Amino acid sequence: MRATKGNENVFVDCGFPPTEAENLRIRAKLMMALTGYIQERKITQSRAARIMGVSQPRISDLVRGKIGLFTIDTLVNMVTAAGLKVDVDITARSPRAKNKRVA
């Protein structure tokens, strides 16, 4: 077995185009934060839905990781409704990262 160092974004490693991979990475991070919020507070999906202003089935989709059903916009609204704060950090890519390939 041989290990290969991957990209900083697992979605790039899975073959997604860079822009789509970045969108997926951001959505996954937001979804993990919301799922963590629900688990840490030990609240029901119904309670989480009321807090976040969505339906219980939407919370079910969230905790089951149905990433394709959520936009960044929707997830940010849910995070904000939960009383959490979203910080955005934008940095320049290193020249090496742009040309880096996984063997």
Where are these regions (language model features)?
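N-terminal flexible/basic segments that precede or flank functional cores
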Residues: 1-32, 93-101
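Generic structural marker for isolated residues within well-ordered, non-membrane alpha-helices
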Residues: 34, 45, 75
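Short alpha-helical DNA-recognition segment
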Residues: 41-60
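DNA major-groove recognition helix of helix-turn-helix
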Residues: 63, 90
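Short, solvent-exposed alpha-helical "recognition" segments
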Residues: 66-71
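DNA major-groove recognition helix of helix-turn-helix/homeodomain DNA-binding modules
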Residues: 72-88
